[in-house]
Curated annotation (Swiss-Prot):
It is found in: Cell outer membrane. Belongs to the bacteroidetes fimbrillin superfamily. FimB/Mfa2 family. Residues 1-22 form the signal peptide. This is Major fimbrium anchoring subunit FimB. Keywords: Cell outer membrane, Lipoprotein, Membrane, Palmitate, Signal. PROSITE patterns: PROKAR_LIPOPROTEIN. A lipid is attached at residue 23 (S-diacylglycerol cysteine). Pfam families: Mfa2 (PF08842). Gene3D superfamilies: 2.60.40.2100. Anchoring subunit of the major fimbriae. Regulates fimbrial length. These filamentous pili are attached to the cell surface; they mediate biofilm formation, adhesion onto host cells and onto other bacteria that are part of the oral microbiome. Fimbriae of P.gingivalis are major virulence factors.
């Protein structure tokens, strides 16, 4: 093929592409401007933690002005930490809403994969018989922005800000083994149980709490006669209702505690850690409660 024929073929390809692409060079009025989207993560103290690795993955649902899903995007930890922009272009809607959720577990991703409308988007905890699995370190955020038309030049870059949606809990129960032995001869886990609750089990896509009430079972261990839980996460309660920590033996609820000895309630704070310290060793029950920054366990003086 000589140069003249190559030129003619190239021109024809460009003309056909222009006809089907909808953006003719002589008239850009119907052309959506491309733009870029980035994700930015914040902690409870409004510190930018995008680059810390706290966000492992993000799923971003894109809805038009009617709430209909038009796209679904995924980002991994490296992309988020590097603030890598996603190039986007949407032709048709006047506005789009980006509904971003970070660190959903595989079950949540599977449940939301085929959602086609924002009103049907929920992030529900896995649970059995009212006992929920501890959620991951969930973040979420929503950004609504107009789609710019009339040019093929780069449009305004956009950033969706995401914030933590769970609270951490850490529990220490001094003298727990001795207390158990005083209430029966058997060993864990045959007859004893510890439950913390209740919270709703569901977030809507727009981060509103709904759903059924659930409890959590701390997966702790007995160390030198004391029960010590790992750090675990819970959904917040409704209307700052306090959590109740219940201790069972032989299926009977023997203790139900919802406040410290000073009256401070067990209220989980989003993006913070709720520390619960219970001392069963003395004649009188002693309960301490404090709220500390994320991942910071309260150190209690021993006496």
């Amino acid at each position: 093929m000589n140069d003249a024929k190559k030129y003619i073929v190239s021109v024809l390809i460009l003309l056909v592409a222009g006809m089907f692409g909808g953006c003719i060079k002589e008239d850009y009025s119907d052309c959506p401007r491309p733009f870029r989207l980035t994700v930015r993560a914040w902690d409870a103290d409004m510190q930018d933690i995008t680059e810390t690795g706290a966000v492992q993955r993000v799923v971003i649902f894109v809805f038009d002005e009617t709430g209909r899903r038009i796209d679904r995007l995924m980002m991994d930890a490296a992309q988020v930490a590097a603030r890598k922009p996603i190039p986007l272009e949407y032709d048709g809607p006047t506005t789009v809403s980006f509904v971003a959720w970070a660190n959903p577990d595989d079950h949540m991703l599977e449940e939301t994969a085929n959602v086609q409308n924002v009103k049907d988007l929920f992030f529900r905890l896995s649970s059995t018989d009212g006992i929920a699995q501890s959620p991951g370190d969930l973040f979420s955020g929503v950004l609504t922005c107009p789609i710019e038309y009339g040019s093929i030049e780069q449009g305004t870059d956009q950033t969706v800000d995401i914030y933590r949606r769970t609270a951490q809990v850490h529990i220490i129960i001094r003298g727990y083994q001795e207390w158990l032995e005083a209430n029966g001869p058997r060993q864990l886990p045959d007859y004893a149980d510890i439950l913390l609750g209740e919270t709703p089990d569901t977030y809507t896509g727009l981060a509103e709490l709904i759903g059924n009430a659930v409890q959590y079972r701390p997966d702790g261990q007995i160390q030198n006669g004391d029960f010590i839980s790992p750090i675990f996460r819970v959904y917040p309660t409704l209307d700052t209702t306090p959590l109740h920590l219940k201790l069972y033996a032989y299926g009977q609820e023997l203790l139900n505690i919802s406040t410290g000895s000073d009256g401070v309630p067990f209220i989980p704070v989003i993006g913070k850690m709720l520390n619960i310290y219970i001392d069963l060793r003395g004649a009188n029950l002693n309960v301490l409660v404090s709220v500390t920054p994320w991942d910071v366990v309260q150190q209690y003086a021993e006496y």
